[in-house]
Design a protein with these regions (language model features):
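Short phosphate-binding/catalytic loops that engage adenosine nucleotides
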Residues: 111, 120, 137, 160
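Residues that form or flank phosphate/diphosphate-binding pockets in enzymes
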Residues: 101, 119, 150
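Active-site acidic-Proline motif in GNAT/NAT acetyltransferases
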Residues: 112-114, 118, 146-147
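Short coil/turn segments at alpha/beta junctions that flank glycine-rich nucleotide-binding fingerprints
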Residues: 35, 118, 134-138
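Acetyl-CoA-dependent GNAT
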Residues: 14-88, 93-114, 122-127, 131, ...
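C-terminal "cap" of GNAT-fold acetyltransferases
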Residues: 3-10, 20, 138-152, 156-189
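Amphipathic alpha-helical dimerization/coiled-coil segments
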Residues: 1-3, 56
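Residue-level preference for beta-strand/loop junctions
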Residues: 59, 102-103, 136, 174-176
Length: 189
């Protein structure tokens, strides 16, 4: 965290603009190479997923949170609608079949290092959960790795539970991919 950076100085928008998705891929490539040693395989994975999202983006069912400070993107989170059949047999590299769903995938959550520890991650998680409720999603899931300790701490604090693990070398090094799921209580009528 850098002195002078405060949550109140950061704005979040929900509309995509040209260049946003490309920049998010760039941030993932740069930050994860530096912090985790991920290679071009990881960047290719991110690019493929963002391309899939761009082609299937539905503003009524999907949501992006693009956090900016002084007109620069400093954080990002994406909620992507998924079919139940895809969700049940998902791996990090599967594509959506396009059916109606009540499942939302949390993807590409990233904060620049100077913007961690100021409450921005918490704010984005609360907004993600609010969008789930507003849009009548009852389930969410995400994939991460065994190296993302701070992220996992945040996810589990908001109710995500580990449901699957597998060894992978998809990011140019061996690690454990982990799936976390969240189920919201349904309102009985």
């Amino acid at each position: 965290m850098t002195p002078g950076i405060h949550l109140g100085n950061i704005t979040c928008r929900n509309e995509l603009r040209p260049g946003d998705l490309g920049y998010i891929a760039y941030l993932h490539g740069q930050i994860y190479a530096k912090e985790c040693g991920y290679g071009l395989g990881f960047e290719a994975y991110v690019l493929e997923g963002l391309q899939e999202f761009a082609h299937q983006y539905d503003p009524d069912r999907d949501r992006v949170w693009i956090c900016e400070h002084d007109n620069n993107i400093v954080g990002f989170l994406l909620g992507f609608h998924r079919s139940d059949s895809m969700h049940r047999s998902d791996s990090m590299h599967r594509s959506d079949s396009g059916h109606q769903t009540d499942t939302l995938q949390l993807r590409y959550f990233i904060l620049l290092p100077d913007y961690r520890g100021i409450g921005l991650g918490k704010k984005l998680m609360l907004e993600f959960l609010a969008f789930m409720k507003l849009s009548n999603y009852t389930r969410a899931y995400l994939w991460t790795t065994n190296e993302q300790h701070a992220a996992v701490s945040l996810y589990t604090r908001y109710g995500f539970r580990l449901t699957e693990e597998k060894i992978s070398d998809a990011f140019d090094k061996q690690l454990t991919e982990r799936k976390y799921e969240l189920e919201l209580p349904t309102n009985s009528k």
